[in-house]
């Protein structure tokens, strides 16, 4: 549940969200998320990771122009620890 609403996530989205939410406020590297989602031998381009994060943001109602839930850093992504989001 997010903001008291049930949100349907794909398996990849749920895996990424769990990992990001595990360490709020800290960067999770792109490499770590790619390995977690697709395995060490996964030949996944960074663009596919970005696509999955965009989809996850959209489902969470996060504004891609000014994200407040999943932030982008140079090396990866950060889950913002925001109590008002209801997480």
What do the PLM-derived regions correspond to, one by one?
Residues 25-37:
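Short coil-to-helix segment of the ABC ATPase nucleotide-binding domain corresponding to the Q-loop/switch region
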Residues 8, 51-87:
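DNA-binding patch around the recognition helix
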Residues 2-15, 27, 43, 78-87:
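A structural micro-motif at secondary-structure boundaries
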Residues 39-48:
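Short, positively charged loop/turn segments that connect secondary-structure elements
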Residues 13, 46, 54:
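Acidic-residue sensor for enzyme active/binding pockets
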Residues 17-18, 34:
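Hydrophobic residues on short alpha-helical segments
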């Amino acid at each position: 549940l997010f903001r008291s609403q049930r949100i349907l996530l794909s398996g990849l989205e749920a895996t990424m969200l769990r990992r990001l939410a595990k360490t709020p406020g800290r960067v999770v590297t792109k490499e770590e998320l790619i390995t977690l989602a697709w395995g060490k031998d996964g030949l996944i381009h960074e663009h596919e990771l970005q696509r999955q994060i965009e989809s996850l943001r959209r489902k969470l109602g996060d504004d891609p122009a000014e994200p407040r839930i999943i932030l982008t850093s140079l090396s990866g992504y950060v889950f913002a620890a925001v109590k008002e989001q209801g997480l």
